[in-house]
Amino acid sequence: MDDNKKKALAAALGQIERQFGKGAVMRMGDHDRQAIPAISTGSLGLDIALGIGGLPKGRIVEIYGPESSGKTTLTLSVIAQAQKMGATCAFVDAEHALDPEYAGKLGVNVDDLLVSQPDTGEQALEITDMLVRSNAIDVIVVDSVAALVPKAEIEGEMGDMHVGLQARLMSQALRKITGNIKNANCLVIFINQIRMKIGVMFGSPETTTGGNALKFYASVRLDIRRTGAVKEGDEVVGSETRVKVVKNKVAPPFRQAEFQILYGKGIYLNGEIVDLAVLHGFVEKSGAWYSYQGSKIGQGKANSAKFLADNPEICKALEKQIRDKLLTPGVDTKAVGSREAAVADDMAEADADI
């Protein structure tokens, strides 16, 4: 850059700083790059698939999927993990369906959880914005976008047409709160439902509610699906769950994680640790027996996971080893995910032979 351009740029930067304050325009090289802080989801496999060890703070996240796929369970798991780190969390329950007893079983400290059950969509989003601007909240969950009913629709008659009202409401609210979320370093999670587009001949007919604004503003979008049942004998005790990272602005997207959600207990973390520890050589598997550092810890995955539950020090050590190996730059976690699924299938077959 020649001297005249340098002087012109310096004058422009000086004027901008006087008018808008110091730091309005910065050179990216002036400050060291910092890793994006993350909050664990409670699922080790999903934390690895997200690439940074969890959901990013200071960003908007959308979690969507069919009914009973585990959307609320996943967000309550995030809240439980955040509270363990001393974070303050809020739950905007637009669906009026939050069960405090179930949340407590998942590890949520319900006494400290802030809960709002707003009457209208405008009220829900205004409360969310005020909580963000307080700079005192670390995690806010809005359950769900589909239940954010505009005031005009509530006050109108049942058969009235209100085309695009909810989409305009979401677009306006997201424009308003996005900057505040970044400044407050607050994680805001929107739960969303799936609808079907009529007359789609090619491609997926599925879409999410509330228009397109949330798709653009969200830094991470997670598609959660129930893929099967977890059984003990003939009794169904949980769900096999697959989460696909369909959008990710903080790490490579399109990775996926598979884990189990046990009814009344939440995400089966110890089972994930056993699978990943075997995959990466921290735990040895011979037939149906699992061994750690030369000593047997259990026959079958369920018994090995129970051993980890009874020995939290070993469980934490294994989890740390896995995170240190897979959450370092240069690790191809997409390839890891496909290998993990293949190994999990092999182990399931071996356990079934017990």
From Swiss-Prot:
Signal peptide as annotated in the record: none
Subcellular location, principal: cytoplasm
Keywords for this protein: ATP-binding, Cytoplasm, DNA damage, DNA recombination, DNA repair, DNA-binding, Nucleotide-binding, SOS response
Keyword rRNA-binding: no
GO biological process, one term: DNA repair
Subcellular location: Cytoplasm
SUPFAM superfamilies in the cross-refs: P-loop containing nucleoside triphosphate hydrolases (SSF52540), RecA protein, C-terminal domain (SSF54752)
Coiled-coil parts of chain: none
Residues bound to ATP: G65, P66, E67, S68, S69, G70, K71, T72
Similarity comment text for this entry: Belongs to the RecA family.
Function: Can catalyze the hydrolysis of ATP in the presence of single-stranded DNA, the ATP-dependent uptake of single-stranded DNA by duplex DNA, and the ATP-dependent hybridization of homologous single-stranded DNAs. It interacts with LexA causing its activation and leading to its autocatalytic cleavage.
HAMAP family, alphabetized: RecA
PANTHER family for the chain: MITOCHONDRIAL DNA REPAIR PROTEIN RECA HOMOLOG-RELATED, RECA
The protein, known as: Protein RecA
Species whose genome carries this gene: Pseudomonas savastanoi pv. phaseolicola (strain 1448A / Race 6)
